[in-house]
Amino acid sequence: FPMVPYVMAAELVSRGDGGFANIWGLQDCAETIHEFANEEQKRQYLPRAAKGDTYAMDLTEPDAGSDLQSVQLKATYCEKDGKWYLNGVKRFITNGDAHISLVLARSEEGTHDGRGLSMFIYDKANGGMTVRRIENKLGIKGSPTCELVFKDAPAELVGERKLGLIKYVMSLMN
């Protein structure tokens, strides 16, 4: 995206409504999908951003907070059906009830640092995730901050395994 017009538009939106500004900012998830997802994922998820579907980045957890290397939400690959499944809890997720989420999850059994984490696309329409709690905030109510529970939630790997934190989240947050 051309950065100057984008930032100008974001500032104007922020003046009008802080909650909407949060939703606007999370559309950067589409940029991460554009840069790192495969062609099929791009065809499936990018047009949905233009149609108004909302996005979230599901990173923090009850025991990991901002220490993303400590993320424990598990991503398990099922050889039988060739799909990934997410299991665990995410907490303090801005816009947590979004249609599409980029989820940081531990894909490598036995790892305890950032090298065992991968990035996944989760589509709310596929089920397997429930919003357990919505934070009662003083303001910015237009963008719910949620606790999410994933139970055998189907997801798609973005890019390569083990690069979730060291490459994709760094790009997402930059």
What spans do the regions from the language model cover?
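Internal helix-loop-helix
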Residues: F1-K51, I93-I100
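Buried hydrophobic positions in well-ordered alpha/beta secondary-structure cores of metabolic enzymes
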Residues: A9, N38, M57, A75, ...
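Glycine- and acidic
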Residues: A10-R15, G25-E31, A56-D58, N87, ...
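Internal maturation/activation junctions in enzymes
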Residues: A37-L73
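Flexible, glycine/threonine-enriched loop-and-boundary segments that flank and lead into catalytic domains
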Residues: D58-K80, Y85, V89-R91, G96-I100
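Short Gly/Pro-enriched turn/cap motifs at secondary-structure boundaries
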Residues: D63-S66, F92-N95, T111, K137-P144
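A short core secondary-structure module
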Residues: K83-M129
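A glycine-rich, basic-preceded beta-loop-alpha segment at the flavin cofactor/substrate interface
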Residues: A125-R132, P144-N174
